[in-house]
């Protein structure tokens, strides 16, 4: 390939890359949406497959696009920074970010407190309310939240709660309980089939699993929970200061 040909190819590649970026910015291809195939883009932009492939590979490397084997190439959802590290509830977090929040309850039931009695400091023969929800930010599933709430401490919470309610507001308004701190443990977990369905991800895709114990103003456990979030949907930043 001559120097002139290489220069021409670079110009074409840069033009295609920019046009794809412009289409994404203008909403032609939205977050989570599949872009056209390489053949379709070749026809659309009247360029070679090599040029299209290089432009797409570059945008994948930049985190703008994501390839799903056997499915195609999709627009990457924008990452949310520290959404799961905040002590405030999810509703408050959405307000602080100027984004709309929504939830979908996928499981709710009374179960034995035995597996959680030590963490919640409650009798093993009591019950907890298990609430499992998919939490959405601007209509995109952000994480799955499974919470276990002690009914011995918060009687009839399962009857008071309705889908869409802020659990932290209910704690404060009905039980004079404010969640002021929590203890979190973070690890990586492979997405199960149900999790992949709700989070719109691949089976086995890496998820952040955040296990949490929330505490009230009197340092008593309020609830325990597990949150599962796609690792490519969130950035966790941890600041440490030496005193």
UniProtKB/Swiss-Prot annotation:
Keyword field contains Mitochondrion: no
Domain named HTH gntR-type: residues: 10-78
SUPFAM superfamilies, per database record: Chorismate lyase-like, Winged helix' DNA-binding domain
Involved pathway(s): Carbohydrate metabolism; fructoselysine degradation [regulation]
Signal peptide residues on this chain, from the entry's feature table: none
Keywords: DNA-binding, Repressor, Transcription, Transcription regulation
One Pfam short name: UTRA
Annotated transmembrane regions: none
Function: May regulate the transcription of the frlABCDR operon, involved in the utilization of fructoselysine and psicoselysine.
Protein's UniProt name: Probable fructoselysine utilization operon transcriptional repressor
Lineage: Bacteria, Pseudomonadati, Pseudomonadota, Gammaproteobacteria, Enterobacterales
